C-alpha cells in the first residue's frame, strides 16, 4: 500500500490540498488571474463580468451578457480543447494568481522561476484560442495528439458515448421535424452530386418539384406531445391573431353593407346574410377570448370562420347589382390573404380555402356574366389576381410558420441544454461538496468570480476551529490481509470498508478528512461546531471496531482497528493550486495521530482533553500510551482506554437506534450487498456473506436514482409546458416592447435584434418579383397595349432580375465570384441595406400597377353624352349611354369623343394591381411594421391622389359603362330604362378598399413582428439562463478538475454513483515520486505571533503552489499530481493512455526532470525566504492500481508495491538528494541521465535494496 500514511511535521498527519488564490493585477485581467481572455478553461469575451449574469429590471440583457452569448461555455459533452505548449491550461491548472513572486521584492524577477513566469505570461497573453469547431465530434486519437490532451479510458468513454449518442439522436429527430422546406431539394442535390457536379450544382427538375411540394407538407413534429407543446407555445398568439382576423372581417362585412346600403333598393337576403355573418363572428370573438377557450377549440373556430367567409363570398357575388365579373375581387383577395396570414391553420387547409374561394368567384362570375363579350379578358385577369394572391399567401404563411417552429425548437433546445447543464451541475455540486465542505467551496467559487486585489502571497483557504475532536483509525493486520489479495481485490476491499466508514461518519456527525493508505481519519465539530463532538468520535470509533470485526469474521484474517482520539484546536482548509483535498493541521492533529499509533487493537485510545468532554458517559481505564509511543512519552500525555458506556449512555443509544429502525422500516429495507466483485466471496457462502453484510448495512445494488431513470425528453417537455403556462404575453410585451413602434425599450436588446440575419431575404425579393410578373400579365390582358408599357415592363424586369440575382447569391454563395458574394452579404446581413432593397423592389411593383393609367383616354364620357343629348352633365345617367347613337360599351377600346388614346374600360384592375403591390409589401418580413405602414400609406396616398385628380374621369366613365351594360342585359332589347340601376362610384370605393387593406396588412405586420420579438426575447432569456447555468457548471468543473483527474471526474459525473461503487484502472508502468521537506516540522510552531501556525501554513502553501505551477507546464503534461501529505508532495506519470509512453519512456524522463526542477525551486525559495528547507525525493517505477475510494466522497489515489517503495525511497533518502530504485536507474541511465550508486539500503518490508542518486539530466550536446 501507499506509504502516504506518514506524517511529516507536528500537526501534519494529513494530506494537503490545493487552494486557489485568485489575484487581479493589471496583467491578470480575468477572475482567475489569467493574462488572456479565457475563463474556466474556455474562451470568454474580455470585459465581461466573470460573475453570473445580472439581469436588469425588465429582464433586459447587459452588454456583458451579450458578450457571453457570443462566446458560450462549451457543454460538458464536448471534448476538452487541445492543450499546447503555450496554453496556460496545458497539463492542468497552469495559473499564476499573483503578479510577482513571494520570494522577491516587488521589483524585477531575475531568477529561473522569473524567466519561467515570463515565458508563461507571454504564452498566455497571446491570441485566445477557441475550442475546436467540432466540439465533441473529434476522435479520441485526434484529441490525444493535439498537444497532449487527456483521453478518457475506454471504459469511461463507452458510457459517455452512449449517452451522447442518445442525446444526438433525439436532437436530430426533433430538428428534422422543425420544417420540411428548409432543406428542400436535398434529395435532388445529393443525386446530382453523385454525377460529378460541383457544390451547389444545377438542381434537377425533380429536386425543384420536391422543393415546391415540401412547402405543402405538414410541418407537424413527429411527436404528438411535442406538437401539442408547440400549439400551447403559440396558443395565446394564435388566439390574438384569430381575434384580430375576426375584427377585420367584421370591418369588411360592414363596408360591404355600407356599399350595398348606398345603392337602393336594398336586398333583404344580402343584408340578412351579412348581418348574420357579423353576429356570428362577434359571438365567436367573445367565445375565443373566454378563459374556457383552449387550444382544442382553436381548430373548430378556424374552420367555422372559413365557413362564414364562404357564405359571405357566395351571397356577396350572387345578389348585388349591377353585375360585373370584377365585382367582389377585392374582398375575395382580402379573404384569401387573411386566411393565409391571420388564420392559425395548416398550410394545406389555407391553400384549399384560398383555391375554393377563387374557384367560387370564377364560377359565379362565369354564370352571371356569360353573355359579356369581354368576359374572357376579365376571367383571365381574375385568375391571375387570385393565383398571385394565393402565391403571396403561401410565401407569407410558409416562412412565418417555419420561423415560429424554429423559434420553438431553438427555445426548447436552450431549455434542454439548460436542464442538462443543471443536472450535471447538481452532480458536480454534489461531488464537489462531498470532497470540500460547503463553506470552503463557496468561498473558492466567490473568489473565482470576484476580482482580487494584488497581494504578495496567494490567498490561503484556512479556518481555525477551537473545540473539535480528531479521530485517527488504522487497520492492524492489514499487511496479512493484503498478502491474501491481489492489488485490485485490495482496492475493492478498502473501497467497501471505507464506504461503510463514510456512512458511519455521517450517522455520527463526523467529517471524513482523508484516507491515507489503510488509515482513516475524521473530525467532529466541523464545519459546524457541536458540543458533543467528543461523544461523536467515540461512537464513531466503536462502530468502526464493530465493522472491522465483521470483516474479520468473513475473511478469517486477524484484522482489527486501532483508534486514537484527541480534542483540541485545528486549522482546516486546502493548500496549493491543484488537486485540492480538505485537510486539518495543528499540533493537536499530530497528537491524535500519535494516539492512534500508541493505541491498542480493538480499543479506543483517548487523551485527558477528550475525557473531559465526555462528562463521565463512558467507563475508562488508564491507557499508558507513553509505553507504546515515544511522542506521547516525550510530551507526558495522559491517555485512557474506553471500557464501555455507562447505563445512561446505553439508554440514550437505544432510543436513537429505535428511531433509526422506525425510519428505515418506513422507507423499506433492501437486501445489502458487497458490490459486483466480492474479494471475500470465496471464504464463505453467499447467504452467510449476505447476512454479515446486512449487519454492516450495505445497500441494494438494484437501487437506482429516480432522476437517472427519468426520461430527459419528458423532463424538458414538462419544464417547457410549465414555462408556457407561466409566461404572460401581455406582460412581456408591456415590459420589454414599446406599444406602437414595437421596438425594445432596452437599446442593447434592440441592437442585438436588429443584427439578426434573415436568410430568406432572397425568397422575399423573388416573391415580390413574381407579383410584378402577375401584375404585368394582368395589365397586358386587360389594358390596351402600348410601346410605353412594353419598354417600362422590360426595364423593370431587368432591374428586378438583377436584384433577385444579387439577393439569392447569399443562399448559394460558393457558386459566384467573390465581389458578388460580398455585395450579397452586405445587402442581406444589413437590416438597413435589405430594407432599402425591399423598398426599391416594392416601388417598382407599385409603379407597374398603375403607370399604364397615363396611357388611357381621359376624356369625360359624361360631357360627350351631355353634348349629344343637349342636357347638362349632372342629368346624364346610364340610360343615356344605352340610348346614344354612338356605341359606347365596355368592349370598345377606341377613344371616346374622338380621343386618340385608347379606352381603359376596367380601371378597377389598376386598383386590384395596387392591392397586389400592397401584398408584395407584406412579404418582406424583415421590414418593421412601422416601415411597412409608412410605405403602404405612401402607396395609398399617391394612388388615391392619382385616382381622384387626373384619373377620376377614367373611373367615372367605367361606372357609367358597367351600369349601362347591366341595363342592356336586364332590358334584353326593350326600351325601358330602370332608374334604380346605380352603383357606388369607384372613386369612392377605391380609397376605402385600399384603407381597409392597409389596416389589415399593418395589423398582420404588427402581429408578425410582435411574435418575432417575443420569440426572440423568450429564446434570449432561455439562452441567458442556460449560459448562467453553464457558467456555474464551468466553475464547478474547474474546481472538480482540481480535485480529480478529468477522466475520473467524467466517470463520476456520468451518473449518480453508489457509496461503495468502485472505479479503478490497472497501469502497467507508472513512475511515482514522493518529495518531502525533511525539516519542515522544525519550522512549524504554533505561537500567537504567527497566528497559531497559520503563517507557517501560508509559507507551505506558497511552496506547494510553486510546485503546482511547475507541474502545470506543458513539458510536464504527462504528470499527475496525486496529493500532498503534510509537507510531502506526491506525483506520478503514465496513468492513462495519453500520458503513458510505452516505447520512448518519456513519462519517466518527465518525472525525473520534474524532481530536479523541484530541487532547483526549493533552492530558489530558500534564497528568497531566508530559510534552509531540505528536500528528500524518492522515485520508483512499476505497475500500480489507480482508482477512487468512496464514490460519494471520492478520493483519487494510487496503490501497489511500486507506491510503497517510492515512499520508502523518500523516507530513507538523504536531504537535498533524489534517490531512485534499480528499475528507475536502468531507464534513466539508458537515456544518459547522470546517476551515482548509493549502495545497499535497508527498506522496511523489502529488506535490502540497491539504490542510486539522480544528479542531473542528459549532458547537453
Swiss-Prot record:
Q: Where is this region: Disordered?
A: 1-195
Which cofactors does it use? Mg(2+); Mn(2+)
Q: Which residues cross the membrane?
A: 196-216, 242-262, 268-288, 299-319, 325-345, 374-394, 770-790, 792-812, 836-856, 910-930, 935-955, 984-1004
Q: Which positions bear Phosphothreonine?
A: 1011
* UniProt record, GO biological process: adenylate cyclase-activating dopamine receptor signaling pathway; adenylate cyclase-activating G protein-coupled receptor signaling pathway; adenylate cyclase-inhibiting dopamine receptor signaling pathway; cAMP biosynthetic process; cellular response to forskolin; G protein-coupled adenosine receptor signaling pathway; intracellular signal transduction; locomotory behavior
Q: Which UniProt keywords apply?
A: ATP-binding, cAMP biosynthesis, Cell membrane, Cell projection, Cilium, Disease variant, Glycoprotein, Intellectual disability, Lyase, Magnesium, Membrane, Metal-binding, Methylation, Nucleotide-binding, Phosphoprotein, Repeat, Transmembrane, Transmembrane helix
CDD domains in UniProt: CHD, Nucleotidyl_cyc_III
Question: Under which EC number(s) is this enzyme classified?
Answer: 4.6.1.1
Bias type Basic and acidic residues, positions: 25-37, 151-171
State where ATP binds.
474-479, 516-518, 562, 1123, 1197-1199, 1204-1208, 1244
User: Listed GO molecular functions?
Assistant: adenylate cyclase activity; adenylate cyclase binding; ATP binding; metal ion binding; scaffold protein binding
Residues engaged in binding Mg(2+) 2: 474-475, 518
**Where is Mg(2+) 1 annotated to bind?**
474, 518
Q: Membrane topology type, per the record?
A: Multi-pass membrane protein
- Which intervals hold domain Guanylate cyclase? 469-596, 1071-1210
- Chain ranges on the Cytoplasmic side, renumbered to this chain: 1-195, 395-769, 1005-1261
Where are residues bearing Omega-N-methylarginine located in the sequence? 23
Quote the entry's note on domains.
The protein contains two modules with six transmembrane helices each; both are required for catalytic activity. Isolated N-terminal or C-terminal guanylate cyclase domains have no catalytic activity, but when they are brought together, enzyme activity is restored. The active site is at the interface of the two domains. Both contribute substrate-binding residues, but the catalytic metal ions are bound exclusively via the N-terminal guanylate cyclase domain.
Q: Subunit composition?
A: Interacts with GNAS, GNB1 and GNG2. Part of a complex containing AKAP5, ADCY6, PDE4C and PKD2. Interacts with RAF1.
Q: Which family does it belong to?
A: Belongs to the adenylyl cyclase class-4/guanylyl cyclase family.
State the disease linkage annotated in the record: Dyskinesia with orofacial involvement, autosomal recessive: An autosomal recessive disorder characterized by abnormal involuntary movements mainly affecting the limbs and causing walking difficulties, oro-facial dyskinesia, and speech delay. Some patients develop neuropsychiatric features. Cardiomyopathy has rarely been described and may be a manifestation of the disorder.
Protein name (Swiss-Prot/TrEMBL): Adenylate cyclase type 5
